[in-house]
């Protein structure tokens, strides 16, 4: 049997030329860092270094940091990525040269009308949308939103109490995922859902579809390897955001907005209402007001940015408290002192809790959900003697920096005291970046922190957590794109008035 097909000479020649052209296409940019004298791992044709992500972004970044030092270069497909770890360089990228050179994040695929979402928008459009949304996230507006969040804190306590009464261990992602979903959908769309007990609700179903995201799935990998297909996909109206979901949310926002414009008597302070108000505000005349489609895009991106992150961080916090009972007890004592007799938390009482702040900050150090920060270089520039050509993605490996023993002695240990007032001066704001830094940091940072702290307070007022036989110790992270655990975090829950689950 002849294994080599009997093809004409012209066919073989065409095949050879095609392979050579494909090889040249796939390696054309791969000599950049060598030419600049920047070290880094050897890329493969077409793929670059993306196969290394199979062991986790954070593992790849930490290995490179250890091997190559402060600066290294690698390739996502053909895209050159420059990793920087020097705090002065990081400050230049995120703050000093944000508007002039490093304004934009890396485009990550065809996004359709979502190109106007604050996390994705570029240059002047981003500046306009950021300035229109900034008043929505002030401390005054956040203070008014606390009762909405607190309501779902009570739902969370009810759900946990029911779990405690079953006597079974609790899977944290289930209960905190439901809490996160309830708060985000309520503040972004003004809808009230108890998602744990109403999983068939169309808002719950559509939001969960929106969040099935993995940067290592074949679709994303093909875009990384062949970025020229992105404009073709845009023309074909194909988006990484599922069309049936965005269509449902667009119709929902339209319906809710029309209903609210008719009912002018009710005073609402959720994000949706604040954005509707901004459309009609005379103060926005210096910038074109948000269009209805832009308003929908912001609501969707709030879900996208807030759901997974909040539920994951809450799970990590409770896990650390369960495995460090002394810290859990100390935090409960602070909560009981500031809020005796399970008094409901307020904006001001949350801000009084220093130890709670330390616990949250230390958890975000160990588990920075945004493992990397990225900015695209808009023009040739030199920083700290390093030449960065236009088009290079500059990446700050937050996870690696948060685990660097040079800045954090015994970095794998959970030590909230690192963030005590007396140690604050030792923390470099460009090494510790759980929410990014500079003009393009996370606009929802204060909201996210308040949301998580309110949940922690309500939960610890009523329950204590302990490891059980199903608890994975030490916790292992899942290999892949996002910072998630290999196995769900499962804990025993004890009601502080005596009921025990998972005993």
Curated annotation (Swiss-Prot):
Membrane topology per record: Peripheral membrane protein
GO biological process: oxidative demethylation; steroid metabolic process
Keywords carried by this UniProt record: Endoplasmic reticulum, Heme, Iron, Membrane, Metal-binding, Microsome, Monooxygenase, Oxidoreductase
Sequence positions that bind heme: 442
One of the record's GO molecular function terms: estrogen 16-alpha-hydroxylase activity
The protein's Enzyme Commission number: 1.14.14.1
Compartments reported by the entry: Endoplasmic reticulum membrane; Microsome membrane
Keyword Iron: yes
SUPFAM superfamilies associated with the record: Cytochrome P450
Family, per entry: Belongs to the cytochrome P450 family.
Function: Catalyzes nifedipine and nilvadipine oxidations.
Protein name per its UniProtKB record: Cytochrome P450 3A8
Gene giving rise to this polypeptide: CYP3A8
